[in-house]
């Protein structure tokens, strides 16, 4: 026994490999740094997360971020994805609703100066709207940090708590959260996919309004009108009838 202890003491500390149990994945990993999982463990953990959806039945990682990531990185990225998805869903809905209700004085538009595409509403809305909004955002973000972040300040300030499920802030006023794990994972996947679609949608909304200078529904109606006229032209051409001219406002769409 004494001989074994002397041999162990003779091994340099720098060459010892530590065995750490990952608190998130529950797997035992061996690495040169305590708690650092090998890439296989990171990939295996990522495959267990909600959001793995057809046609990408495996983890969708074309840029290879997982190759150099840790489980902590993956958890932090998932938290960011959920947060950005939720904001994008609100933004996409806000674009459409804001453009339809901009004529209602109740919505901080007492003088009717808020009009046109939603990309210009930011500059048109008065200061009385932004101060309460910034306070509300600050309160919401402070609550999210308090619930989920392990170290709000200092090194690794945005690391998540080991027992925190990314995106789960305990906000469920309607009691919609399933108690069955599989049902919960399915619902989480739906939220992620809707958030991903919303992030693409809000980017498309902004690009479309910058190029076309028209509101979302207005563009949709004009596009439909143009398609009808073009189809009518084909019929008229086949029948030898005079062609219906395309209005100037539809030519650029």
From Swiss-Prot:
- The chain's transit peptide is found over 1-39
Positions contributing to chlorophyll a 4 binding: 194
UniProt entry keywords in alphabetical sequence = Chlorophyll, Chloroplast, Chromophore, Magnesium, Membrane, Metal-binding, Photosynthesis, Photosystem I, Photosystem II, Plastid, Stress response, Thylakoid, Transit peptide, Transmembrane, Transmembrane helix
Q: Does the keyword Glycoprotein apply?
A: no
Listed binding positions for chlorophyll b 3 are 141
Q: Give an example GO molecular function.
A: metal ion binding
Give the UniProt entry's GO cellular component terms: chloroplast thylakoid membrane; photosystem I; photosystem II; thylakoid membrane
Q: Which residues bind chlorophyll b 1?
A: 45
Transmembrane segment boundaries: 87-107, 131-151, 197-217
Annotated localization: Plastid, Chloroplast thylakoid membrane
Membrane topology per the entry is:
Multi-pass membrane protein
**A family per Pfam:** Chloroa_b-bind
Instruction: Name what induces it.
Output: Transiently induced by transition from dark to light (at protein level). Induced by high light stress (at protein level).
Q: Where does chlorophyll a 2 bind?
A: 84
Any single biological process term in GO:
photosynthesis, light harvesting in photosystem I
Q: InterPro entries from the xrefs?
A: Chloro_AB-bd_pln (IPR001344), Chloroa_b-bind (IPR022796)
Q: Does the keyword Plastid apply?
A: yes
- Residues binding chlorophyll a 5: 190, 208
PANTHER family xref list = CHLOROPHYLL A/B BINDING PROTEIN
Q: Which family, according to the similarity comment?
A: Belongs to the light-harvesting chlorophyll a/b-binding (LHC) protein family.
Q: What is this protein called?
A: Light-harvesting complex stress-related protein 1, chloroplastic
